Amino acid sequence: MAESKLVIGDRSFASRLIMGTGGATNLAVLEQALIASGTELTTVAIRRVDADGGTGLLDLLNRLGITPLPNTAGCRSAAEAVLTAQLAREALNTNWVKLEVIADERTLWPDAVELVRAAEQLVDDGFVVLPYTTDDPVLARRLEDTGCAAVMPLGSPIGTGLGIANPHNIEMIVAGARVPVVLDAGIGTASDAALAMELGCDAVLLASAVTRAADPPAMAAAMAAAVTAGYLARCAGRIPKRFWAQASSPAR
């Protein structure tokens, strides 16, 4: 069986499910969901931390033994993202960053030009960069070439719950990647998470699918099981697809 731990940079994680915190109704529900998910790495919007003092969320993650992964959510330019990452490094004492540079508020689609520019600057500044990108294999390769520790293509736009719109693109990114591939954004339900792993992704990052579910802790548990099931199925190897039926028992 393949390596069971997720390895990004110089760190390893037993869980292949990375959680986000956006959209949670309150910290009590978020805590239950995080515990149910089994996650060891959870994103934190540094702007949100600055706005509310951040003590409640950061204290919660610390108490649960979960590593915070600051992100640059809301940034619209490379300069803005780099500054936000540097502030996060000072505030949270980490050089890890989930890099987001968004083109507009309606689509929340990554701005490819600004994203690459920010990635280059942050890598040069010693950051471990995990960029949120489109499902374009060429852009994913470009980000990898800049020195990013992973690539994080979207399945579909953030918060839509549309699942994986272009499975073949994700497979192409996986096939060409020399770093971990994390499916990020668009997950709606457990089957989407399982499919991401079956397509070859090394991990899944999600937030809205859990925080906006009718029962967030139950959905978090479902997502954890789905990620594990998809990973195990990929490692086991699916049977080839056939045009015609084939009896499972030999004919006499």
Swiss-Prot record:
Q: What is this protein called?
A: Thiazole synthase
Write down the chemical reaction(s) this protein catalyses. Answer: [ThiS sulfur-carrier protein]-C-terminal-Gly-aminoethanethioate + 2-iminoacetate + 1-deoxy-D-xylulose 5-phosphate = [ThiS sulfur-carrier protein]-C-terminal Gly-Gly + 2-[(2R,5Z)-2-carboxy-4-methylthiazol-5(2H)-ylidene]ethyl phosphate + 2 H2O + H(+)
This chain's function reads: Catalyzes the rearrangement of 1-deoxy-D-xylulose 5-phosphate (DXP) to produce the thiazole phosphate moiety of thiamine. Sulfur is provided by the thiocarboxylate moiety of the carrier protein ThiS. In vitro, sulfur can be provided by H(2)S.
Q: Which positions in this protein are listed as binding 1-deoxy-D-xylulose 5-phosphate?
A: G159, A185, G186, A207, S208
Query: EC no.?
Result: 2.8.1.10
Cross-referenced InterPro entries, in alphabetical order?
Aldolase_TIM (IPR013785), Thiazole_synthase_ThiG (IPR033983), ThiG (IPR008867)
Q: Where is the active site?
A: K98 (schiff-base intermediate with dxp)
GO MF terms here are: thiazole synthase activity
Look at the named UniProt entry and state the broad enzyme category this protein falls under.
Answer: transferase
Supply one GO BP term.
thiamine diphosphate biosynthetic process
What gene is behind this protein?
thiG
What Pfam families has UniProt attached to this entry? ThiG
Q: How does it assemble?
A: Homotetramer. Forms heterodimers with either ThiH or ThiS.
Q: Which UniProt keywords apply?
A: Cytoplasm, Schiff base, Thiamine biosynthesis, Transferase
User: Matching CDD domains, A to Z?
Assistant: ThiG
Q: Show the GO cellular component annotation of the record.
A: cytoplasm
Its pathway is:
Cofactor biosynthesis; thiamine diphosphate biosynthesis
Its family?
A: Belongs to the ThiG family.
Q: Where in the cell is it found?
A: Cytoplasm
